[in-house]
Amino acid sequence: MSTKLEERQKLRQDEIITAARRCFRASGFHAASMSQIASEAKLSVGQIYRYFSNKDAIIEEMIRRIIDSRIEGMQDKTVVEGMPQALAWRKTLNEDDDALMLEMSAEATRNPQVAAMLTAAEARMFANACAHLKKQFPHLSDEHIRCCVEITAVMIEGSIYRRLTPLKVPSEQLEPIYQDILNMLFAEK
């Protein structure tokens, strides 16, 4: 059972993360400063440092929360249900998270610590997706499952990136093609 102090600390961390998300969306990770985050959170910089040792610690917590949310969103769903439609229509679970992950990827090209955080988060997401798919498709080998996860990750992440540009092909034409790809990936071997 958590104490009132722990609850207050968690609430304060949530407020800081919310403020940081707004700052990072507006200015990018690289340009957003701790003073901007403090101002947005209506705290002093010193108060922020009580909860997070530096900006990278805030980024790390943000990545952890986004990945936790994505893993939770994966539960109780099969890969083939809804995914062709989501890909074809470029639907997303959380547009803000997608934009922040794109921003984090850009920051990772400049900051080895952020690159390491993203690598660890991706490994966690990949392992969880493999375990989730293995439950749905126990007839597939572990190697094939890993290939399926990699291919679906490329399709999902590519769709997230491509959401920034207009569709060149109607979604109605793309959806059955995505369905065929997924059917082929998860067919009995």
Go through each PLM region and give its residues:
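Amphipathic alpha-helical segments used for helix-helix packing
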Residues: 92-122, 165
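Short hydrophobic/aromatic patch on the recognition helix
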Residues: 41-52
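Helix-turn-helix/winged-helix DNA-binding modules
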Residues: 28-29, 50
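Alpha-helical DNA-contacting segments of helix-turn-helix folds
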Residues: 59-66
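Basic, helix-initiating cap at the start of DNA-binding domains
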Residues: 1-27, 34-40, 57
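Hydrophobic alpha-helical connector segments
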Residues: 61, 71-98, 148-152, 175
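Hydrophobic/aromatic-rich alpha-helical bundle segments in the mid-to-C-terminal region
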Residues: 115, 119, 135-189
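Outer-membrane beta-barrel domain signature
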Residues: 71, 75-78, 120, 125-133
